[in-house]
Structures are given as C-alpha cells and as structure tokens.
Amino acid sequence: MKIINIHKTTTTAEILALLQQKLNPLFHEQKQSDMSFDIAEKNGAVEIWQPETYEGFLFRIVPHGTQLHITRSEHYVDDVNSITVESILNSLFEELAKDGNVTLVLEG
C-alpha cells in the first residue's frame, strides 16, 4: 500500500469524478491504445479495473482526510499497463492536491 498526503481533504466522489473524466483519455494518449478501464465507487473506495484483461482490481484508492491510501494489485506490479496507470494517477493526484503538493507518507 502507498499512502500519500495531498494536503487537502477530498472525498471518494471527487476522486471518482476526476478519474472518470481524465484517466482513460490520458491512457489512450500515452499508450496509443484503445484499452479502457472501468472506474467505480465500491464500499467507500474508488476501484480501477479492466475485466477483459485482468482479474480483479488494478488499483483501489481510499481517501482518509488529507491522505489517499492506494492499494495496487500485487498480481500486476510489473505490468506495463498498470505502470502507465500509476504514472497517470500520480499526475492526477498532483492536480487534485493543494498547490500541486503531494507528499509520500508510506510506500510498502
């Protein structure tokens, strides 16, 4: 799990809206691929998955105050599409953060 601090309080709905609007277009642009990801709220978390290619979620994001707890599926750590999604998420979290300031709290 990775925990980042975005220095402002956010909600599942805000994260969901941002990812639904921007994740797939940015992925298509970066990978020159028509693969799209499903993004939805599940039990207080935002989950990203691609059922045609992967079993289960790729990422699960849970807001806790100013922190985001991000779980990456251990099955796809070295997968190029998962790495691309993670890179896009990092840039989108900077966009979401107060003054673009993202601090890594824990990575493990």
Question: Which role does the model predict for each range below?
Answer:
Residues 26, 36, 56-58, 92:
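Intrinsic disorder/low-structure terminal segments
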Residues 5, 36-38, 60-62, 67-71, ...:
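Ser/Thr- (and often Asn-) enriched beta-sheet segments in non-cytosolic proteins
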Residues 22-26, 66-70, 88-92:
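Short, low-complexity, polar/charged sequence segments that are solvent-exposed and flexible
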Residues 78-108:
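A conserved amphipathic terminal alpha-helix motif
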Residues 26-32, 53-54, 97-101:
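Short secondary-structure junctions
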Residues 11, 44-56, 60-63:
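Polar/charged, Gly/Pro-rich intrinsically disordered segments
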Residues 1-47:
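Negatively charged, low-complexity tracts enriched in Asp/Glu with abundant Ser/Thr
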Residues 55-83:
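Intrinsically disordered, low-complexity regulatory segments enriched in Ser/Thr/Pro
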